[in-house]
A protein has these predicted regions:
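NAD(P)+-binding Rossmann beta1-loop-alpha1 motif at the extreme N-terminus of oxidoreductases
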Residues: 2-61, 67
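A short helix->loop->beta-strand "cap" motif at the edges of active sites that frequently abuts
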Residues: 33, 93-96, 118-120
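Rossmann-like NAD(P)-binding element
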Residues: 62-97, 147
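ADP-ribose/adenylate-binding Rossmann-like module
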Residues: 89-111
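Rossmann-fold dinucleotide-binding core
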Residues: 112-185
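Active-site-proximal catalytic alpha-helix in oxidoreductases
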Residues: 156-169, 180-207, 213-231, 247-255
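Interdomain hinge/lid region at the active-site interface
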Residues: 211-287
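NAD(P)-dependent dehydrogenase/reductase Rossmann-like domain
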Residues: 250, 257, 261-265, 271-340
Length: 340
């Protein structure tokens, strides 16, 4: 009987919620021949991930979990990134790659620069699952978009290695810098939350809410739905960390509200005509966006370069091959073409 081959590499997943488990299910595939270790403060989450086959072993201590790992993926909330980085920094082996998936990059890159030795490499990533969320057994990130964000002066080989995760997950890649990413998050993630908050406060703190709450229907409920299952400390930390970008986005939102108030100051017929035009334009634009969002990988899919498999990348990066800088340049060129 032939003995099983030694694992090509070791991967550690810190954070075993829905996304961390989905990443594990992709990386623990037998054909990749990787040893996947999981770590989560929630023992129940770790047990479920182990039982699902997303990880091969549970380690309660994050530092021990990272010892000897070639790749460490942080799938934890933004508020937990800094303490996790500080907790694992001394355990990381030379040339280990740490991929963090938080929704803000500038602060996480600063924390990594303070905590991690120079010969350990951090790369930012953010996964946008397609909508609607696929039903099992379809993987969560099938046809998703993996945004890759590189810190200044980052190692190009580590960046290429991170890019290899995308096809393993069934996702496509898109490259942006940290400032651009955080600015986009201010508009697409943080501004909607604050507008939901402002809508709720504008209505509930005005005279008449005592009676108004009885007649408020699904329109108001949907407009304030982002407040439903919110983790207030985590959300507040994100908003505060991105406050400069968010303040600019609020300024743009105020300009739009002022324009709407100007329209409402006209006569009834003119107001209705102008509002109808704006509503139709917004409805059509949103429809196009939702159609594209359902399959973000369709954009210029034929421009994605051929790159070695993740298994080959493990072998090449961690001792069995040479630098792959030409490959990552091709990946960057393809991503740049997507933006044009």
């Amino acid at each position: 009987m032939t003995s099983p081959a030694s694992p090509t590499g070791k991967v550690t997943l810190i954070g075993l919620g829905t996304r961390g488990t989905a990443l594990g299910l992709a990386l623990a595939k037998p054909e990749l021949n990787l040893r996947v270790v999981g770590c989560d403060r929630d023992a129940g989450a770790a047990k479920r991930a182990l039982e699902s086959g997303a990880i091969h072993h549970v380690e309660r201590n994050s530092g021990r979990a990272c010892e000897g790992s070639d790749l460490v993926v942080l799938a934890v909330p933004f508020l937990e990134v800094r303490p996790v980085l500080e907790g694992i920094a001394t355990a990381l082996k030379v040339d280990a790659v740490v991929v963090e998936t938080a929704p803000l990059k500038t602060p996480t890159f600063e924390w990594a620069a303070q905590a991690m030795p120079r010969d350990r490499h951090l790369v930012g990533a953010y996964l946008i699952a397609r909508s609607p969320t696929p039903e099992p057994p379809t993987p969560l990130f099938e046809r998703a978009l993996m945004i890759i964000v590189a810190p200044r002066g980052s190692d190009s080989t580590a960046l290429e290695f991170t890019a290899r995760l995308a096809p393993t997950l069934g996702a496509s890649t898109f490259f942006v810098d940290a400032d651009e990413f955080d600015g986009l998050m201010a508009g697409t993630r943080h501004l909607p939350l604050l507008l939901s908050l402002a809508c709720y406060r504008a209505v509930t703190e005005a005279p008449g809410w005592r009676d108004g709450q009885r007649i408020a229907d699904d329109t108001f409920a949907e407009a304030t739905s982002l407040l439903t299952s919110l983790d207030a400390p985590r959300a507040a930390a994100e908003l505060a960390a991105n406050r400069e970008n968010l303040a600019r986005r609020i300024g743009l939102a105020i300009e739009q509200l002022e324009e709407l108030r100007r329209i409402l100051a006209g006569d009834e017929t003119q107001t209705a005509d102008e509002l109808e035009t704006l509503l139709r334009e917004a409805m059509q634009g949103r429809r196009r966006w939702m159609q594209a969002r359902s399959d973000p990988s369709h954009d210029h899919a034929d421009q994605r370069p051929e790159m070695p498999s993740l298994r080959d990348s493990f072998a090449r990066m961690f001792g069995l091959g040479k630098d792959q800088r030409d490959i990552i340049r091709a990946a960057k060129d393809a991503s740049t073409a997507k933006k044009l």
